[in-house]
Amino acid sequence: MRKSHYDASIDYLITIKYSFKGESIMTEMQQYVEDVLAIIQRRDPEQTEFQNAAREVLTSLVPMLEKEPKYKQHHILERIIEPERVIIFRVPWEDDNGVFHVNRGYRVQANSAIGPYKGGLRFHKSVNLSILKFLAFEQIFKNALTGLPIGGGKGGSDFDPKGKSDREVMHFCQSFMTELCRHIGPNIDVPAGDIGVGAREIGFLYGQYKRIQDAFDAGVLTGKGIDYGGSFARTEATGYGLLYFVKDMLDNKNIDIKGKTVIVSGSGNVAIYAIEKAQALGAKVVTCSDSSGYIYDANGIDVATVKDIKEVRRGRIKEYIETHPDAEYHENSRDMWKIPAFIALPCATQGEIDLESAKILVQNGVKAIGEGANMPSTLDAMAYFQEHGVLFAPAKAANAGGVAVSALEMAQNSERLSWPFEKVDATLKDIMRNIFEESRDNAAKYGVPDNYVAGANITAFMKVADVMIEQGLV
């Protein structure tokens, strides 16, 4: 089989090969990784998203595995790729016209070695088991990077809240939680929001949980409203954390973020607050987008207008030009990557930057990428950025701010206290700096300096794997 651009790049970037009689042979640990990836392919051949996520993580671990054979001896890779539990259930609900519908609900409880399962709920028509296994697998490592005691999980449904009334969304959320409540708890599994699950949905979900359990267990969900156990800075956390990581990455190379042009995709929480923090740090953000198209504003995006469109009116991004006639609206969001910039922040969805887009970004002068969405760059694109010296902040490290503040929300719920915004934000900044420094240092330690993909994966894997060894074969 012909190797993909990504596979060839991985060979070049992070693996060690030896030549014997003119042929290239794999090291023991390379073969170990390939054998484990073959297990996934054999068991779940249709789960391409999960396969890609596993390949991205496991291949990047090879330099560390060469020096730390204990992980192979304890069969950690075989164990960590298999979720501890996968729950699938039906979700019946009734729309405003009295018509009955049935959607499918999921919860993937991936790993609880260092704490209760933690990860968001996604409501979107594209949701399937492969996507949720990929997200749950990523969540294991993202959560471990925070240094907080939280395991990895993910859930959701193929229900799409778009176009539904508040009443219909409430009916669905109540039905969804009626089953999910059997499998979660403050010390078991703590879901949060994700695509399609915002403050409204979290409120409906928590209300139904409280009704069924007859208890005010605020710590069972995060992303709640401030008045019933939520945390200040939770809404801003992922976007702010992304910029804290990117700034540290640039500072490490003596590059000042001030005055740099930034292109941002998306217009949800991550994108909005990434724009807000980038502007606060002195950068100039010129784009944002939604599923209908993108805005280019050469004067700099007016984040207050975007907030009004998306958070208040729940409108489309093209409405921006109604109050900013000098801005441009274009329907093909992929063309956004053609705009010259120094920094690109993909904050929309997975796979939005492919190899072709990566080439365009590099050609147009982008020197740093910060992933705000979950795995928005394809494997080919990631390899291309690495090959061309682009500073690349991978999602599991760069967007860990959201789950970090979710864990801080859990801590506040346990204390029955509410921390001020400034304390939460300062703690978030410290957590993101620690993630950056550990990723940087481990990348250098294991022979792949400036490769934050490998550095983050190695750091997170070792945190989880060491505990799995201590806890035995469970």
PLM-predicted stretches and their roles:
Residues T48-Q51, K67-H74, G147, I184-G193, ...:
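Flexible, glycine/charged-enriched surface loops at secondary-structure junctions
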Residues K3-I25:
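Short, Lys/Arg-enriched N-terminal segments with co-localized hydrophobic residues
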Residues K70-H101:
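Structured beta-strand/loop patches that form or line metal/cofactor-binding pockets in enzymes
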Residues G230-K338:
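Glycine-rich phosphate/diphosphate-binding loop of Rossmann-like nucleotide-binding domains
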Residues H124, N143-K258:
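Glycine/serine-rich phosphate-binding loop and adjoining beta1-alpha1 elements at the start
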Residues T27-A53, M249, V362-V474:
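Adenosine-phosphate binding glycine-rich loop
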Residues G293-F392, A397:
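Rossmann-like adenosine-cofactor binding region
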